[in-house]
Amino acid sequence: MPRRKRSPEENERRAKIRELLLSSNISSMEDIQDLFKETIAEFMESGLEAELDDELGYGRYDYRNKDTDNSRNGHSSKTLRTSYGDVEVAVPRDRKGEFEPQLLKKNQTSVSQDIEEKILSMYAKGMTTGDIETHIQDIYGIEVSDTTISRITDKILPIAKEWQQRPLEAVYAVVFLDAIHYHVRSEGQIVKKAVYIALGINLDGKKDVLGMWVGENESAKYWTTVLNGLKNRGVEDIFIACTDNLTGFSAAIGAVFPKTEIQNCIIHQLRNSSKYVSYKDIKELMADLRSVYAAVDEPAALDALDAFSTKWETKYPKISRSWRENWANLSTYFKYPQEVRRLIYTTNSIEGFNRQLRKVTKTRSVFPTDDSLFKMLYLAMVDITKKWTGRQRDWSMIHAQLSIYFADRMPE
């Protein structure tokens, strides 16, 4: 293959490099690495000095153009990790401590740190490693491999596992429990795994993800393990637990938190009820069920359920039977005022969170390991929960109502 013809600019650059190598007495690869380190230090220091000039509005010793009561205040030394080894950089300071350099941020310890943060951010938004490679190449002109991306994202695992084990509050007003399912490669096979999620609302009305656990397909036994884990991390009481109607779930909650009231999700019950209803009946049947769950109180709801049974028993006997069998945990919300009812009668809070997780993970049909699934969910969770800054709607009223219903369990 013929050698590519260089441009005049490239030839000029090469001549300067040759001149630099000769004047620097380069005799080994180690000498070249030292030269690279000096070049990085010079580039950083020149850029930082220019940034401070811009911040203060005047150059060094240019006192005639000084129009500020702030001034330079020497330098601090910072060790920067690079692929060629550690580099000492003299970072200029200002007297007021207001200078926030952008080229080398205050907490930055590596020249690759900014790119690593970008990779983690893209991974958290569900981009594939291939997409991330292309994006980094387009923006920075840097090639990163699948292995490099995995190595960078793996750095988050110890942080994620520490988060999973952090201490929790002693009392939660409401905890929503649900699971979402993914395919993971295990011992040469693709298996279905459940991600168990607990989302809590504390007594200040703040929402928080208490944990996410990758386990075998959803079971009451595993939920018992999850609930015991919450207890071991400091949770002493949960006023109300909102769940789907998984067999054995109520017993699992009762075994760990015996005082907790259980509210089965009405939306899950409606989905199960409508599963085998013919298209021509669905609208009318769902309207009749609405008379049950939207009733003003429990006696009115039971009357509506009786009316539903009379009308639909012959055609769909399993529906009214299911509502009656699960009534104890479906009807919990009727004892509370409307504000509390709205909060607990569905698992919308956790389902909304799950929807956002699925949006991030939809590009992955199969995860190579449990850890790869967990780190993506953790990064996505951090990204999603950044917006969870406020309290739940009507929280002052809800708290006052819970203080009446759970007077003996409400902390002072």
Model-predicted regions and their roles:
Residues 240-247, 252-288:
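Conserved beta-strand -> loop -> alpha-helix junction used to position metal-binding or nucleic-acid-contacting
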Residues 130-141:
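DNA-recognition alpha helix
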Residues 1-106:
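Short, conserved DNA-binding cores of transcription-related domains
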Residues 86, 90-95, 103-107, 142, ...:
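RNase H-like nuclease fold core
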Residues 113-126:
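Short, amphipathic alpha-helical "recognition" segments used to contact nucleic acids or chromatin
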Residues 3, 258, 291-412:
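Acidic/histidine-rich catalytic cores and adjacent linkers
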